[in-house]
Amino acid sequence: MTQVDVLIIGAGAAGLFCAGVAAQQGLNVLVLDHYAKVAEKIRISGGGRSNFTNKDIDPRAPHTHFLGDNPMFARSALSRYTAQDFIALVQKHGIPFHEKHKGQLFCDRSAQDLIDMLLRECEAGAMGGTVTRWQPCSLVGLTYSDAPEPHYVAETSQGQVQAKAVVVASGGLSIPKIGATDLGYRLAKQFGMRMVEPRPALVPLTFSANDWQPYAALAGLSLPVAMQTGEGKKPISFNEDLLFTHRGLSGPAVLQISSYWQTGKPIRLNLLPDLNLAHTLISAKQSSKKNLANTLSAWLPSRVADAWTARQAQWQRSLPDTSDKALQQLADSLQNWSMTPSGTEGYAKAEVTAGGIDTRDLSQQTMESKQPGLYFIGEVVDITGWLGGYNFQWAWASAHACAKALAARLKPL
């Protein structure tokens, strides 16, 4: 039987980072993953360049960029290991990077630079600390015993493992083609943890074939919009780019909104957020003889202008021949466009999974669950960040908090 201090289940961003930090605290760590490759989500993120953090994260106010039943749970970990801490590590390894948009940091060359950095960190154990990886290796079962001392025994496809502590870093259900499974949720339920129902997040929205028929020909077009969902005094809104697809909507604005969207509720879009369109059109009647489609093409892609004006006969006239009321209706349709999605593209295209292990059953200081010696970190926990590097920073911060807690518990000074 293989004996280690810590067994980490999952060789993704959180699992690898936790392993490296723990080994550098003198712990012997075994990382296992049923998938043959490490950190595949890092590899494919950011168009292959990995949006590895966001420099504008305010760790004191995680509710501004994270969601979950209790987003403030993340404050402790995010405050103790900040975006600036991870940036310093990236710089230490000589990895060139750049800011692309709204604090989002990307590797200049390739996400592989970041993966190689994490693997080098795993090799930099101190005080006898080591990291061993078993891949591909499936977990068959996990049991706990408190005699003669508290420990776990894992049955795996490569044999038995005895560990003083277990860290579940197995991620969510997003992108199953790179190995996502519900293993973390099953382990949580086995040991009595509560769950917040998982759902796809940062995911394209879809519409019924009938509802989307007028817009299907716009697939591939992108434009900046203001997008909103929710009711009451504080609806959720984002000003980002939107992308038309064959089945619905994608792009940063849509991915952001999708994390908050509730089934059966409408979304509202303003396709010209920086323009008083009705006033502009009515004022232009005196000086322009263009038809409405050509007029709108000054601010919108011509395919959008053509598709929109084709919806009603009164919008297919020249600008001077269109009534003020019809122009107002056209402006409203573009600047207060309300549609109810039929669903999402699901886990296959979701960047992350919302929901997960209920944070009420975890320590915000250590990530340890109410089951002694069992920890949960990263995406498997009910903390979900915005698009733009927030979810990776949660992975680094929760992993760091966990690794430091493991060292304090298993290698006390």
Regions found by a protein language model. Name each.
Residues 2-4, 156-165, 237-239:
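Core beta-strand elements of the Rossmann-like FAD/NAD(P) dinucleotide-binding domain
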Residues 4-31, 402-407:
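N-terminal Rossmann-like FAD-binding beta1-loop-alpha1 element of flavoenzymes
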Residues 7-9, 161-177, 188-189, 242-245, ...:
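Short hydrophobic core segments
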Residues 34-129:
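Conserved N-terminal/central alpha/beta ligand/cofactor-binding core
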Residues 34-38, 43-44, 52, 56-62, ...:
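An anion/pyrophosphate-binding glycine-rich loop and adjacent beta-alpha core
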Residues 125-139:
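A conserved beta-strand/loop element that lines the FAD pocket in flavoprotein oxidoreductases
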Residues 135-149:
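A conserved short coil-to-beta-strand element within the FAD-binding core of flavoproteins
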Residues 135-136, 306-384:
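A glycine-rich dinucleotide-binding beta-alpha-beta segment and adjacent secondary-structure elements
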